[in-house]
Structures are given as C-alpha cells and as structure tokens.
Amino acid sequence: MFTLNKFLLLLFFLGTINLSFCEEENAEEERIDEPDETDVEVEKRFLPIIAGIAAKVFPKIFCAISKKC
C-alpha cells in the first residue's frame, strides 16, 4: 500500500509540473500572436501619410484619364 501511495504521489507531482509547463507555453504563444505596440504605432503613423498622398494624387490621375477637368 505504501509503494502505491508513493507512486500516486509521484504521478500527481509529475502531472502538476507537466501542466505548469503547458500553461507557460500557451501563455507564450498568446504573447507571440498579439501584435506589438510598436507595430501598431508604425501603422498609425504611416496610414494617414499614405491616405493624404493618395487624396492628392488620385484626383489628378482621374482628371488625366477622363479629361474632364
């Protein structure tokens, strides 16, 4: 009976450690999947610049193509 208790205790201990490692890996994967704050900042900086340039260039291109200026 004593050896069975030791075995069950060892099994429980190893299972707890294994579960702990799985939770750490899942947390790390979630951190990897989330976009970095710097990436979001870069997108916020360049998107208005590109939109502004497109707003200035598009009417000129449309005017040149349709020739209805």
From Swiss-Prot:
Where is this chain's protein located in or outside the cell? Secreted
InterPro entries in the cross-refs: Antimicrobial_frog_1, Frog_antimicrobial_propeptide
- Signal sequence span is 1-20
What Pfam families would the database entry show?
Answer: Antimicrobial_1, FSAP_sig_propep
Q: Which domain of life is it from?
A: Eukaryota
Q: What is its main location?
A: secreted
Gene Ontology biological process terms in this record: defense response to bacterium; defense response to fungus; killing of cells of another organism
**Found in which tissues?**
Expressed by the skin glands.
Keywords in alphabetical order: Amphibian defense peptide, Antibiotic, Antimicrobial, Cleavage on pair of basic residues, Disulfide bond, Fungicide, Secreted, Signal
Any GO CC annotation of this UniProt entry:
extracellular region
Similarity field: Belongs to the frog skin active peptide (FSAP) family. Brevinin subfamily.
Q: What is this protein called?
A: Brevinin-1Pb
This chain's source organism reads: Lithobates pipiens
